[in-house]
Regions:
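Post-signal-peptide N-terminal segment of Sec-exported extracytoplasmic proteins
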Residues: 42-72
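Short, well-ordered, aromatic-rich surface patches in folded extracellular/luminal domains
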Residues: 22-45, 79, 94-148
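A short-motif feature that recognizes glycine-rich, charge-decorated loops
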Residues: 61-95
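Short amphipathic beta-strand/extended segments with alternating polar/hydrophobic composition
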Residues: 50-57, 72-77, 117-127
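Sec-dependent bacterial lipoprotein signal peptides
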Residues: 1-20
């Protein structure tokens, strides 16, 4: 009886060890969605085209509405040509973290560019001072967003 009890405890300890090892992977910081090119997160006060849009390299679009769920849609990968051209523009590397520079911490929309040069840029969509490369990128994403 004592031996079977010890074996049971040993088996339970091994199981907990394995589960904790598996669980440590999920507690690491979230990685980028596989195949994601860009994500546009509209601020909570957006009056037109609300929601967060993620664009994937295979033509997949996912539109999230807070806790209400997500809509999915696919476009032909050729429809992403303008966005991919905007993402390869060398001028993107010169963009700052926010536009205008005085934008408050939680204000504005956020554009996240995925890939090897991952970065997030916050901007005021009503600002007339956005750099042309950022305007082009936003226009490409919003054109895809308008398909919903």
């Amino acid at each position: 009886m004592a031996i079977s009890m010890k074996l049971s405890w040993d088996a339970l300890a091994c199981l907990l060890l394995v589960l904790s090892a598996c669980g440590s992977d999920t507690s690491s910081p979230a990685s980028d969605p596989p195949g994601a090119l860009v994500r546009l997160q509209r601020n909570s006060g957006a009056t037109t085209l609300p929601g967060d849009l993620t664009v994937f390299s295979d033509g997949g679009l996912q539109l999230y509405f807070d806790d209400r769920g997500a809509l999915r849609k696919s476009v032909a990968p050729t429809d992403l040509a303008g966005l991919q051209a905007a993402l390869t523009d060398p001028a993107l590397s010169s963009l700052a973290e926010s536009y205008p520079a005085t934008l408050p911490a939680r204000a504005g929309d956020t554009l996240t560019i995925y890939g090897t040069h991952r970065r997030s840029i916050r901007y005021d969509p009503s600002s007339p001072d956005l750099p042309p490369v950022l305007q082009r990128l936003i226009a490409e994403v919003m054109a895809l967003r308008s398909r919903f």
